[in-house]
Each structure stands twice: as C-alpha cells, then as structure tokens.
C-alpha cells in the first residue's frame, strides 16, 4: 500500500533519556494534528521498548535501525528480528549505506535480514543508492537495480508489497554535492519502472519510495511534490523536533 511517509533515522545518537525526551517532544508536537503522512522514528536498539511505550504508536511508528541475519542463538551482541518485534517496534531499517560501507553487508546478508523481518511481522525500510564514483560513471541505475534484485527479487509479489524502499544518493551526503528534486524524481521513476518489469504495474504503483539524501525543511516540499517521491528518510534533521516537524508538514 503506497503511503506518504516521513521516517527519522537517529543513527548512533541520543542516550536513552535524550531519546525519550525527543520522542515525547515529537509526540506532543503532533497532538491535535493530522499530518498528511505516516510518521516513523528509527531509534537505537536500547531505546525501542521505552520509546514504543512512551508515545502514541498509532501516530508515530517505531523502527529499529538494523536486525541480525540469524534467527537466534550463539551470536553474541546481535539483536534478532523477533527481539525487535517484541519491543513494540513495527519497522526495521535495512541496507542503509552506512551498514553496507562500514559493516560490509552484502545483498545476500540483506536478503536474509529482509526475510527474517517479514517472518516476524516487521516492515522493512530497505535502503538502496549509489556512491559518487558510480554516479559519475553513469552506473547509478545499474547499481540500484542490482541492489534491489540481489536482496528483494526472490520475494513473492505479496511479500514485496510489504517493503518500503528508501533511495539514498550516497554521493550527495556530506560531499557538498546535492541531488536536485529532478534527479531524485528521475531515479525514483526508474526504480518504479524496474519494479514494474519484475512484478507488474500494480505492485510498482503501490510501492512507497522514500528519498534519503539530506532532506530538510528547505527542500522537502519540492522533493515531496514529485510524483514518484513518497516521502523521506531523514537523518540529522530528525534529531530535533523543530527541524523534523516542518518536513512532516511539507506534505
């Protein structure tokens, strides 16, 4: 089901006390408001249960930022999809560019994580995107197609329909280069065409595709006005209610 979504990704930020204050502040800011999008916050594992218990989860969905590629057992330090689901979180961010780059997550590992997330009733927010060298070599379409196919194309149409995609132009994050709304629309439209070729138009048209490249209060309206951009996966701006709310209200 295609929806407008604004999802925050806190990354490795906030202590539990700080995270609870941030979540409660957002909950308060949304009281009495009916935004034209679903709102999700991705928090560290340590915060999930406390945050889910402290806010109105009908108004704000809670996401983990990762999960293990194993079901359970002797994997010290790992957190399984079942554990995430037991906290009250309903979503899990998978395949983020930082996980791919720093923790060497491969399409095969991510495929397993997606399957475990779905098996435990979690909605994956699956990230894709190319780095600067790939963009400059004109390989951006090829790269995102391979990322999608390598981790998701063994799913049935029914299961694929449960996935949220998030496109991150890795080349535009922290490089001083920015992706224009037109560039975002171009690749989102390409992604939707790739999905249509595999699963048909109905599945493609129903897929939510978020934009994850330095989206902020200044550019959110222009980005979200594009027909194939269904919202944003927000990093730094999600760590302050006064920066996150204008993005939510950009719809």
Curated annotation (Swiss-Prot):
Q: Where does substrate bind?
A: 9-11, 174, 214, 235-236
Catalytic activity reported: D-glyceraldehyde 3-phosphate = dihydroxyacetone phosphate
Q: What is this protein called?
A: Triosephosphate isomerase
Entry-linked InterPro entries: Aldolase_TIM, TIM_sf, TrioseP_Isoase_bac/euk, Triosephosphate_isomerase, Triosephosphate_isomerase_AS
Gene Ontology MF term list:
triose-phosphate isomerase activity
Where is the protein found, in the record's own terms?
A: Cytoplasm
| Subunit structure as annotated in this protein's UniProt entry | Homodimer.
Q: What family does this chain come from, according to its entry?
A: Belongs to the triosephosphate isomerase family.
Class of this enzyme: isomerase
Q: Which pathway does the UniProt entry assign to this protein?
A: Carbohydrate biosynthesis; gluconeogenesis; Carbohydrate degradation; glycolysis; D-glyceraldehyde 3-phosphate from glycerone phosphate: step 1/1
Q: Mind telling me which PANTHER family this protein's record contains?
A: TRIOSEPHOSPHATE ISOMERASE
Q: Which UniProt keywords apply?
A: Cytoplasm, Gluconeogenesis, Glycolysis, Isomerase
Question: What Enzyme Commission number(s) does the record list for this chain?
Answer: 5.3.1.1
Which purpose does this protein serve, as stated in its record? Involved in the gluconeogenesis. Catalyzes stereospecifically the conversion of dihydroxyacetone phosphate (DHAP) to D-glyceraldehyde-3-phosphate (G3P).
Q: Which CDD domains match?
A: TIM
Tell me one Pfam family matched here: TIM
Q: Which residues participate directly in catalysis? A: 96 (electrophile), 168 (proton acceptor)
Which Gene Ontology terms describe the biological processes this protein takes part in? gluconeogenesis; glyceraldehyde-3-phosphate biosynthetic process; glycerol catabolic process; glycolytic process
Record has Cytoplasm as a keyword: yes
Query: What's an example GO cellular component term for this entry?
Result: cytosol
